[in-house]
Structures are given as C-alpha cells and as structure tokens.
C-alpha cells in the first residue's frame, strides 16, 4: 500500500503518548502484508486488518469491539479459518538510539527458528548478533506491524548475556528517534522484563493469523 499504514500511524502516536480515543469502537484497515491479517487492540479501541474477501457485514456479525471483543478467540478463529494463528502478544514501543553499534550482521543466523518465524510474518528481515562466531545470540530487524521496524531478540543459552543489554544494543542499530516495535507473549516474562528494562513501553496487543478461508 502507498503511504503510512493506519496501524503504523497509531502506534507511532502511542510511542509519543497520544493514544486512540477510548470509545469501545473498532476500525477496519487493510492488511499491511499480503497473506497476514491481525487485530491490534489498545485501551478501548481496536483495529482489524482483514482482507476484502470478508464483507463488512460479516465482520460486524462477529461482534468486534474495543473492549476485548475484537480479540475474541471465536472471532479470530472464524477469520483465520483453518490457517495458522499466532499467540496474543503485548506490543511494546521504543525509539532507536543510534550510536556505534555493538552488533554486527550475521547472515549465518538466518536459519535460526526465530529468524524463520520473523520471515513468515514480516518483510525485509535482517539478522544481527555479536561478532564471536560461536555466539548464536540473535537480533532480527524487519518491517513488521503496520510497516514499522520490528525487533526480535533471543540470547544464546550457552552465553551469559543480559537480556536488557541485548535489547539496548539492538536499539543502536536504528537511527536516533526512529519508532521501533516489539511483540512479546505475556507468558515470556523473561523477555518482557528485558524489553521493559531497556526502555520499551507496552501500548497495545496484537494477534496475527494467516487466513485459509
């Protein structure tokens, strides 16, 4: 699509403390990536990115609203059909810090499971890590939610890196002030604490699916 996607716009505003109106409403938007749909929910407001083979009437009949209805498992399952459904994640935002990067490009990590997952739902995925070839700590940067830069991280369990330090190192890969998003499962408390400690702030939830209707 041309221009800034509505999801990118609302997430960028949220990164600056400007959140959608809390009115219980929802808005339909076009998917930001072909073959991937999703729901992004804020406090009292939701956005459904669904392809045009689903009519407005069908969406309304599923009962979405901004107070949790748009993320209803029944609604998501109906829209996904027999397709893959991702977990319901917390969306966190931060800004790039620029500076001298500690991480280096690591094309050898492209087959890492986290990198493969990123490639399945995002675009322009690049992989970074620390320079030591035996260190499989991974950072992915990609075009993710709404076309914004999205970051994912995973520490090599054989190394003693601190999660928050890795996230901070990832932010140096981005120009100072650039909005970056991350999605984290609520049950992944270790990763969630790392993002929070590195300055990310929770602003919304997201659930993605690849529809097979």
Task: Outline where the language-model segments fall.
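Alpha-helix C-terminal capping segments
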Residues: 121, 129-134, 155, 166-177
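Conserved active-site alpha-helix within GNAT-family acetyltransferase domains
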Residues: 186-205, 212
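Conserved acetyl-CoA-binding loop-helix of GNAT-fold acetyltransferases
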Residues: 151, 159-174, 191-197
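N-terminal charged segments
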Residues: 1-87, 102-124
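Conserved catalytic-core motifs of GNAT/GCN5-like acyltransferases
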Residues: 85-94, 201-213
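A conserved beta-strand-loop-helix scaffold within acyl/acetyltransferase catalytic domains
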Residues: 133-149, 156
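Conserved GNAT acetyl-CoA-binding A-motif
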Residues: 46, 174-186, 206
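Short hydrophobic/aromatic beta-strand element in the GNAT-like acyltransferase core
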Residues: 89-91, 125-131, 138
């Amino acid at each position: 699509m041309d221009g800034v996607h509505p999801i990118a716009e609302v997430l960028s505003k949220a990164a600056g403390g400007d959140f959608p109106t809390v009115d219980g409403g929802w808005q339909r938007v076009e998917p930001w990536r072909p073959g991937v749909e999703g729901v992004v929910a804020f406090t009292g407001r939701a956005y459904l990115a669904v392809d045009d083979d689903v009519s407005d009437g069908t969406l309304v009949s599923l009962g979405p609203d901004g107070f949790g209805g748009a993320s209803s498992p029944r609604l998501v399952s109906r829209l996904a059909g027999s397709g893959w459904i991702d977990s319901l994640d917390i969306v966190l935002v931060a800004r790039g810090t620029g500076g001298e990067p500690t991480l280096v490009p690591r094309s050898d990590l492209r087959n890492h499971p986290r990198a493969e997952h990123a490639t399945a739902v995002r675009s322009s995925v690049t992989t970074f890590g620390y320079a030591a070839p035996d260190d499989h700590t991974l950072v992915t940067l990609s075009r993710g939610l709404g076309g914004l830069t999205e970051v994912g991280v995973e520490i090599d369990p054989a190394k003693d890196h601190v999660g928050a330090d890795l996230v901070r190192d990832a932010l140096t890969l981005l120009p100072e002030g650039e909005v970056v998003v991350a999605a984290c499962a609520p049950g992944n408390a270790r990763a969630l604490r790392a993002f929070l400690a590195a300055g990310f702030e929770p602003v919304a939830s997201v659930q993605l699916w690849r529809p097979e209707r």
